[in-house]
C-alpha cells in the first residue's frame, strides 16, 4: 500500500465493508502506511468504535487531517450497477460505498503525506491524523472522545482539514470554512384521550399545540450574518393518535431541529421555545439534544494555504461556504483550532451507485500536498 497510487489505495479501503461503527481493518492498513513514514500510531477504542490518533513530530504547530473510515449502509445491493463493496472503475469514475464519503479523501491525504514527507523529511511542526469509525453513526465514541483525550494531556491541534466531500460541481470549487450549529427538540404535548363523539370529556393535544407550533414555524430567530444564513426551524416528525378514526389522541409527539448561526446560542433558542410553549399554556415535556455549536474559520494561515493550493491546482479560486449539515469539525473547532473542510464532489454521497471521478482524487491529493507544503515546509 505504501507505494500505491491514490486510486489503488482508495480501492483497498472501499473493498473493506466498514458499515458504521465497523472499521473493518481500514485503520490498521492506514497505521501500516503511516508507520512506515515515521508516524506514531495510537488506537483508541471506545465501546464499539475504533479511533486512530497518528502523529509525526513532537513540536507545534500541529496540522491534523480528520476523517472517518465508517460508511453508511449500502441499501439493496442488487440496486447497484456494481457491487458496493467492490471498488470498480467505470468510465473514469471509481464506484463503491465510501468512494466520495470519505475513503477517497483518506487515500488522497495518505498520498499527499507520503509525497510531502519524502520531499521534506525535516518539515516543521507535526502532521497528525484523527480518524474514527463513528462519524456516520451516533458520534458518541468517535472524534469527540479522542478530542477529550488529547485535551486531557494538553495536545493541541492548530490547523485541521476535515476530508468531508465539500465540493459541488468539481473538486475544490467549494471549501467549507464553517458549519451551522444543530439543536434538536423532542416535544410531547399531553392531552386526555377520549371518544371523538365526546370531545368535552377529552383534551385534544393536537388542537392545543397548533397555535404554538404555528408560532414556532413563523418565528424569526435571527438575521444571519456575512458567513451564515438566518437560523432555520424545521419540524421533522409529528405523530399523534392510535390509528383509529374515532379516538382523540392522548399525546402529540413533535420532533424539530434548529440549524443556527453564530448570532444565537443553543441556550437562547431553548429559552425562546420554552417561552412560546408556556405562553400557550401547554402541558408538555421536552428533551433537547445538542449536536454542536456553529464554528467559523474566516481568516488565518490554514485558509490562506488552502485557497492558494486549490488555485495552484485548478487555476481558479475556490468559494467559501458554511452551507450544509454538521461534521466532526464541530468537535475540533472549540479547542481553538482553525478548521476547514475540503474533499471530493458530494453529488452521490449516501446514494446508490456512489462514485468519485478518479482524476478528482489525483487533484485532491495535489491540493492536500500544496496545503502541507505551504504550512509546514522548511
UniProtKB/Swiss-Prot annotation:
Needed co-factor(s): Zn(2+); Co(2+)
Q: Where is the active site?
A: 70, 135 (proton acceptor)
Q: Does the keyword Coiled coil apply?
A: no
Keyword Secreted found: no
Which Gene Ontology terms describe the biological processes this protein takes part in? Answer: diaminopimelate biosynthetic process; L-arginine biosynthetic process; lysine biosynthetic process via diaminopimelate
EC number, as in UniProt: 3.5.1.18
Q: Which reaction does it catalyse?
A: N-succinyl-(2S,6S)-2,6-diaminopimelate + H2O = (2S,6S)-2,6-diaminopimelate + succinate
Q: Where does Zn(2+) 2 bind?
A: 101, 136, 350
Write out the coiled-coil annotation as residue ranges: none
- Give the EC class as a word: hydrolase
Enumerate the residues binding Zn(2+) 1. Answer: 68, 101, 164
Q: Would you say which domain of life the source belongs to?
A: Bacteria
GO MF term list: acetylornithine deacetylase activity; cobalt ion binding; succinyl-diaminopimelate desuccinylase activity; zinc ion binding
Q: How is the cofactor bound?
A: Binds 2 Zn(2+) or Co(2+) ions per subunit.
| Keywords tagged on the record | Amino-acid biosynthesis, Cobalt, Diaminopimelate biosynthesis, Hydrolase, Lysine biosynthesis, Metal-binding, Zinc
Quaternary state and interactors: Homodimer.
| UniProt record similarity statement | Belongs to the peptidase M20A family. DapE subfamily.
State the PANTHER family in the record. ACETYLORNITHINE DEACETYLASE, N-ACETYL-L-CITRULLINE DEACETYLASE
Q: What is this protein called?
A: Succinyl-diaminopimelate desuccinylase 2
Origin organism is: Alteromonas mediterranea (strain DSM 17117 / CIP 110805 / LMG 28347 / Deep ecotype)
